[in-house]
Amino acid sequence: MTASLVEDTNNNHESVRRIQLDVAGMLCAACASRVETKLNKIPGVRASVNFATRVATIDAVDVAVDELRQVIEQAGYRATAHAESAVEEIDPDADYARNLLRRLIVAALLFVPLADLSTMFAIVPTNRFPGWGYLLTALAAPIVTWAAWPFHRVALRNARYRAASMETLISAGILAATGWSLSTIFVDKEPRQTHGIWQAILHSDSIYFEVAAGVTVFVLAGRFFEARAKSKAGSALRALAARGAKNVEVLLPNGAELTIPAGELKKQQHFLVRPGETITADGVVIDGTATIDMSAITGEARPVHASPASTVVGGTTVLDGRLVIEATAVGGDTQFAAMVRLVEDAQVQKARVQHLADRIAAVFVPMVFVIAGLAGASWLLAGASPDRAFSVVLGVLVIACPCTLGLATPTAMMVASGRGAQLGIFIKGYRALETINAIDTVVFDKTGTLTLGQLSVSTVTSTGGWCSGEVLALASAVEAASEHSVATAIVAAYADPRPVADFVAFAGCGVSGVVAEHHVKIGKPSWVTRNAPCDVVLESARREGESRGETVVFVSVDGVACGAVAIADTVKDSAADAISALCSRGLHTILLTGDNQAAARAVAAQVGIDTVIADMLPEAKVDVIQRLRDQGHTVAMVGDGINDGPALACADLGLAMGRGTDVAIGAADLILVRDSLGVVPVALDLARATMRTIRINMIWAFGYNVAAIPIASSGLLNPLIAGAAMAFSSFFVVSNSLRLSNFGLSQTSD
């Protein structure tokens, strides 16, 4: 298996490879931070290591994959090529959880009698019998050795490379408590005389077997629930990836059918899909009709009808009917694979607050050893007994836990990404999510966003001796060379376009060309008539069409305006409810479009938008967004077309409708694959909920460590309680993140 690579090029024309490696053996945030630091020391390497997903994402220039693996292995970990999600079926978190559960069960069963006997023999020495020390040692040995081996193994590996991690703290605490207990049991001491139960407790022998075993049990329990929760958090993504077909039936030229692995399907090959089967690749229907379940892509259970010439998406399921499809995109080039990559890439990125947490975790473990040593020395200097000072040191070592810092952001993002994918919302990264709470203005494009984008010619008006059919024929001939949605509607209205020469497209204005020796222009009325007066009949047709919310283009032949073509679109049923939902959240909505003022206002009135900014060229849309930001507004932009790309990139939060152009999708921060606009407020709510969860996690993580270590240093925490608190801390963070998996369950799907 080769490493997962993505080629790119920087400004110096040097080849940049994106390499993803799975890193095994990382059990805490300090582990991930150390691997990241080691990788970033390599010249030409920029690396990010995600503790939650155990994936190192590396942008490298002139660096071999083997060199990267060697550096990771020298840091004490194992590196393998990242398994592509589309074929990944193994859940490492579930396997790790099962391993921990076996150790936890054995440790818990032995811990109960060990804790009871250890406490009794320490407080009431008269109850001791011959061989009592060997009994305690026999009960403790499996716990502090085999059950705690995952911690000891990592600690030994760290020591080999002169490093330290959370496991170093745990292992040191367990071994120290065990060693001190063995010394107390097997080294002769002066008998003590105590009177009363409290004196017996306060002056009991320092037998810390129950602490060593208890810390092992609590930490194993915490790690088990953490691993199980992380497995559940990633289940949505694994379920998404598992929807891909494993095999495909290819139609051979002689009509025979051949079953091959899905990965071997090539573009332009014809393949067969039967009821209940998953479509293997993106393609065009050649033969047959069927109903398709698009929920894998859109999150909506609404079936879609497919017939010859229909486009279909890989990863969706045929409910009934039989289809023969010509593959247009296969493997990693399909829309389904791209969506899975979006979810993965979102988990690779780090929020600003997580970068701070990583820097703290990197120096945290050495600091804990220093603090523990200073705390123990202070107690000794204050006249405390060695037993008391050791108890304080042990408490500090056990309670310190940088794991919460490392889990706070990645687990929340993992759950949110998976849940978002189920809802048809794909989060591309943290950049915009960090400003989501400040969003106060939502800007909408019109065509394809608020409307269906399925344009059709409603009326054709002619003048100057031209008939409507001739005007439409000339317009269709020129527009046949254009890809604009208006052009598509005009061409569809006249099925037999004539040949065109000297075609030229004028961005934001219109097109021109030569048809049958006539110079024909089609476009905005103001552009077509800028050098010639407009006929009263055409102007009347324009006003009437725009009053209905239609787009009207003028046609001129040899410099004389001779026709007006009205293009109708349908407002989405979900638009009004979506705008109402946004307004109820206190957000201001704006319609920003390149269409004319009258048509834009007609649509805005239907959906409930008060502010309309029309007749905007693509670059002018960017200026509008920037002006809003300069006025202190935090802006979200919703769009789908090529002309929306710059505005989406300029906005604080860009939301692209998933059926939009690659330019729009590439510039956006959130991708909404449903046609329904009802997903817009849901997407904003999910983003807000994600950032709220991250903030709660970070407050807990920082607050826990800031408060716990001083309390332990002051001697107010028993080491056993400290171990339980440390395990609960990580469990709380992961469980809090898991609440996002229920997001939207109470909301009505559009």
From Swiss-Prot:
Tell me where in or outside the cell this protein is found.
Cell membrane
User: Catalytic site residues?
Assistant: 445
The reply to whether Magnesium figures as a keyword in the UniProt entry is yes
Q: Which reaction does it catalyse?
A: ATP + H2O = ADP + phosphate + H(+)
CDD domains in alphabetical order: HMA (cd00371), P-type_ATPase_Cu-like (cd02094)
Instruction: List the coiled-coil residues.
Output: none
* Family in the record: Belongs to the cation transport ATPase (P-type) (TC 3.A.3) family. Type IB subfamily.
Its recorded name reads Cation-transporting P-type ATPase B
Q: Which organism is it from?
A: Mycobacterium leprae (strain TN)
Recall the taxonomic lineage recorded for the source organism.
Bacteria, Bacillati, Actinomycetota, Actinomycetes, Mycobacteriales
Q: Which gene encodes it?
A: ctpB
